[in-house]
């Protein structure tokens, strides 16, 4: 690997406009850090690209040498795919330009943008791009994997709102992908992750929105069953303007909480209404009436405030692990299992996230994008979070154990952005009937699997055994 790194460095240094960072460089340590602290890896070389030509140069050199290559946009990969040990990281974090056409309600943004970059630019025109819920997330990884957030029920997945991509493929060429130009790649990039190349620009549709109604409240342990049963049945007929997420977690020990809640299991309810304020008030009041909530807040906030309110809950450097799946229906047996699980949470930062999709995201035809099955409305994410490596085993074992217990009730399928790095066997499950088409596109555009640090769709000639050894 050191010889490969030296070969890559020597090849790039005369024609690369950005920064080439190696161990010992003053900014290397900061540059190699990613969001998930479980993956404190040490790349042999970080190529921080300034423009598309830099990306092309890095990709061509990586392809020619065969060096292990990761692509970093926001460095927010839950599975740690934004980095690697000893190899090359193609870093797009300096490429964050956003251009908004307010009249056409369109935007173009570069591959290194964070959600915050896009939100601030589009809000100046009173517009939004439907994305995730943590503003320091990289937009590329989110969008390419699908992209869910507060606006999913109203406007669809992030990938549903993309009209075009500019892609650097494994041979270093630049291609445009639109419905009528490279349509197979356009299809695959909407949900297929980073398998097909490095996206340097996205062309997206925007929607008018500047403020939302946000209601939040904590339901105590005795009320959790009733809340889940009501939520399960209520959301199936709820307007698309309403997004109601529930987190089952342990309440903090802060003085602003009643004594009976501190450190105890709670259902944390967050309801976001994106339509007319008065209509939203009625729906939110109906929902809250069944929650018997404590510490209630119900207010109109700016969209930018909505997009940053969870940032501090998911800081850089903590350790994260998740297991996720879909349900057609949350039957009472599943609810019983969730109630047992919340009592046994390994730490206060670990939670069971529940969301109801449906709405606009379910109205896209099944084969229109590479994104997995949209027919199951309930999505669950078992997200373990902790600060120190000595607690890895207890948190990872908790997530795996609960997932295995719930798995028989789940519908086959998984959202790739919620997958951890040890779930390569579930990737075909994520894409289901789209798998063969995905493999065909991958085989054509990346036959040697240069872009393999992702939830990988191997080309037709790449064996799963080889793939796993290369990712380890």
Regions found by a protein language model. Name each.
Residues 1-472:
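Soluble FAD-dependent oxygen oxidases
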């Amino acid at each position: 690997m050191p010889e490969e790194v030296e070969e890559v460095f020597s090849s790039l240094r005369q024609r690369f406009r950005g920064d080439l960072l190696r161990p010992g460089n003053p900014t290397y340590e900061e540059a190699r850090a990613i969001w998930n602290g479980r993956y404190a890896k040490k790349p042999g070389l970080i190529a921080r690209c300034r423009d598309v030509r830099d990306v092309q140069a890095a990709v061509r050199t990586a392809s020619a040498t065969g060096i292990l290559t990761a692509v970093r946009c926001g460095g927010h990969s839950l599975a740690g795919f934004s980095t690697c040990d000893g190899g090359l990281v193609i870093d797009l974090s300096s490429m964050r330009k956003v251009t908004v056409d307010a009249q056409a309600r369109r935007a173009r943004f570069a591959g290194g943008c964070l959600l915050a970059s896009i939100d601030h630019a589009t809000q100046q025109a009173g517009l939004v791009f439907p994305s995730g819920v943590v503003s320091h997330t990289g937009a590329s990884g989110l969008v390419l994997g699908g992209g869910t957030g507060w606006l999913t029920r109203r406007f669809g997945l992030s990938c549903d709102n993309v009209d075009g991509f500019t892609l650097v493929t494994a041979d270093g060429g630049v291609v445009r992908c639109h419905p009528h130009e490279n349509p197979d790649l356009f299809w695959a990039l909407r949900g297929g992750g980073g398998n097909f190349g490095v996206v340097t620009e996205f062309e997206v549709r925007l929607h008018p929105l500047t403020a939302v109604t946000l209601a939040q409240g904590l339901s105590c342990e005795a009320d959790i069953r009733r809340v889940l049963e009501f939520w399960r049945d209520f959301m199936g007929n709820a307007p698309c303007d309403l997004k109601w997420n529930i987190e089952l977690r342990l309440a903090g020990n802060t003085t602003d909480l009643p004594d009976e809640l501190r450190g105890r299991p709670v259902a944390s309810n967050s309801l976001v209404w994106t339509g007319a304020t008065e209509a939203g008030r009625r729906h939110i009041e109906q929902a809250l009436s069944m929650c018997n909530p404590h510490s209630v807040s119900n207010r109109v906030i700016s969209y930018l405030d909505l997009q940053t309110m969870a940032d501090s809950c998911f800081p850089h450097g903590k350790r994260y692990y998740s297991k996720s799946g879909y349900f057609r229906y949350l039957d009472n047996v599943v609810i019983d299992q969730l109630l047992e699980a919340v009592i046994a949470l390994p730490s206060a930062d670990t939670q069971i996230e529940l969301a109801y999709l449906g709405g606009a995201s379910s109205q896209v035809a099944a084969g229109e994008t590479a994104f997995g099955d949209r027919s199951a409305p309930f999505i669950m994410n078992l997200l373990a979070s902790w600060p120190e490596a000595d607690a890895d085993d207890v948190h990872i074992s908790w997530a795996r154990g609960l997932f295995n217990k719930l798995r028989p009730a789940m519908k086959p399928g998984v959202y790739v952005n919620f997958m951890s790095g040890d779930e390569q066997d579930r990737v075909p499950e994520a894409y289901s009937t789209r798998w063969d088409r995905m493999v065909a596109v991958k085989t054509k555009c990346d036959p040697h699997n240069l872009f393999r640090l992702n939830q990988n769709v191997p080309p037709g000639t790449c064996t799963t055994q080889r793939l796993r050894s290369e990712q380890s």
